[in-house]
Amino acid sequence: MPHIDFDTIPGSIRVPGQYIEFNTRNAVQGLPQNPQKVLMVAPMLTAGIQPALEPVQLFSDAEAADLFGQGSLAHLMVRQAFANNPYLDLTVIGIADHSAGVQATATVTLSGTATAPGVVEITIGGKQVSTAVNTGETAATVADRLKTAITAADVTVTASGSGAAVTLTAKHKGEIGNENGLTVSTGNTGLTYQANAFTGGAKNADIATALSKVAGKHYHIICSPFSDDANAKALSNHITNVSNAIEQRGCIGVLGMSASLSTATTATGKINDGRITCAWYKGAVEPNGIIAAGYAAVLAFEEDPAKPLNTLEIKGLAVTPDAQWPLFAECNNALYNGLTPLTVVNNRVQIMRAVSTYTKSANNTDDPALLDITTIRTLDYVRRSVKERIALRFPRDKLSDRLLPKVKSEILDVLIKLDQAVSTHSRLKAAGI
């Protein structure tokens, strides 16, 4: 047997000649790149041409409108994601509404006669829809025009009704319809209004089947618009299964919430997963899915798994009223309960500190081991770096006593390079570079 192992030159050749092969197993000396692939699970409309439960890679929100329906939550989540990261590697899998689901509804009733020209504006889920008002127009006339404008807009509701009443119905069934904020402004037109918030939505779609369809592919970030207990549990179970020591396709899940601190921390306490992070934007008018989509896109843009995400802006979210801004005690409590606060700084919505929902060990002991979401992302990257180095260096080597020191050497080299990457960053930061 030859002392040098060849992959393509048999050792039994007796014909004289010069036989040369290339071996690139030792070519890679550095650490692997860390591009982030994002999977978005989102509700679609029947008008969409993409079959439900079939993932598709997207590059613009215009594609999402065609594939999943204009004004669907999938469409608007894709728009929000690309607004925060135009270079996003995004795959979307659309899901149909639950067969037992109920659509949320809201009403806006105008009254009076316009005494001056102006604009009536309605904001639905953070999207503004407006119509001009002329002097002398009745409330019913303006309401009809407003319904037409809403129907034509990229919003997650439809408009109907008679007379001066406008009935808004969520396009998607489930509790997600209740998350649409609703505000109305009649300006100085002389018209008045009465508005009732979205209520009645029940039974969100189930993401478990959609996740099972993509279980064999590696996505680094999975974004879900549903923050209800059942779907959060399904997301947690899926991520645990694909990220374990056998499958080794490490990923994190991203959720969003706009509820009160008490409601949000109760939800994260039930999740308690070091691989799931939930952005909390108190009092937001956007649905939770829009918050999650922007947060996931910002996470994906930061390829350094250990770099903190503090102060990064999430675009596309309306600035909440001052009364909704959380106090220091609320933010601190949120961070102690697995909730990532989003705060308004200089008229921009920013991440305060990105944490996971994990706070308690299996025996209910306080455990900050996976506090920051960067911790599990870093561990995933270290595992992948070691695994890829071994796979590159020793793809078909026989397990022997001579091989083990080589494997150890390669692993140590990877770990040293990882440490050097952190040390170099620290030295540059200390030098003000």
Q: Which residues are covered by each model-predicted region?
A:
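Structured, hydrophobic secondary-structure cores that serve as assembly/anchoring elements
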Residues: 1-89, 303-433
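Extended, beta-strand-rich, solvent-exposed assembly scaffolds of outer structural proteins
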Residues: 60-66, 111-181
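Extracellular Cys-Trp
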Residues: 80-98, 161, 171-309
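Disulfide-bonded cysteine-rich modules in secreted/extracellular proteins
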Residues: 101-114, 206-211
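Second-shell loop/turn segments in exported
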Residues: 129-137, 225, 396-400
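Extracytoplasmic/secreted envelope proteins and their assembly/folding machinery
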Residues: 140-143, 147, 208-211, 236, ...
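Conserved short hydrophobic interaction patches
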Residues: 145, 149-153, 238, 242, ...
